[in-house]
Every structure is written in C-alpha cells, then in structure tokens.
C-alpha cells in the first residue's frame, strides 16, 4: 500500500538571505539579521576532516566529498518527493528515482524506518528563525513525527 501524506496548510514568513564576508544571514520580518545555523556550525573545529584530507590527498577527498554530496542530494529529493505523494500521484516521474541504485537503497532504509512515522506535514523547505537563540536556517520538513510536531532534517 502506498503512503498518502496529509499536508496541513500553514503560513510562514519568507526569509530573505544576505551574504556578508562569505557568511549567510537570514533577515526576519522584523529586519533582524540572524546567522544561518550552517554558518554557526562551520566555526567548529574540523580537525577530523582536515586530517582525513591530508591522509588521502585533495584529489581523493574532493572526489569522495563530491560523490557523497551528489548522493545525499538525490536521497533528499527522494524523501521530499515521497512526502509530496509523488509515488501515488506521479508514478512515471517517481520511477525515475529507481534508476539511481545507491541513493534508492538509502532512501528505502529511510522510508521503512523513518518516513513512515511522519504525518500531518505543515511545511517543507522553509526558513525558520529563533529570536531566543538568534539563529536561522532552512528546514527540510515540519510535521508530526510519531504524533509529535517536529522539525525534521534529512541527513
């Protein structure tokens, strides 16, 4: 049986983005500038990645990183399309995903273990911000996960 996800209409403000000194900031409706969560996390020590890059060399590191990023993007699109009911509403388009073997297998694991716990999708690919923490970012999905309204990020 194919899943059919319910989408709950909500209105969230669009957040503009600006880049200052190679750092992304989101502009709230109140004109506050908050750094993206990615910008905040990029400040953290990347010692492990740096050591790996030194060990394998730039060419290998760039190749592996590029392949992993492309695979992650494909899995992300599969999750998004699945939650948008593409499997049942546009089966021919959905079949295209099956041609990407490894991403399809990874998606299958997410589908069976994670995506089935999602219901009542409120938003996808939207900007969120916190006045309390003074940070912002884009979220993959806001929905109920096991009955609890949650922010969901596909990684």
PLM segments and residue spans:
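Conserved catalytic cores of phosphodiester-cleaving nucleases, focusing on short active-site segments
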Residues: 76, 137-155
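Metal-dependent nuclease catalytic cores that hydrolyze phosphodiester bonds in DNA/RNA
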Residues: 1-136
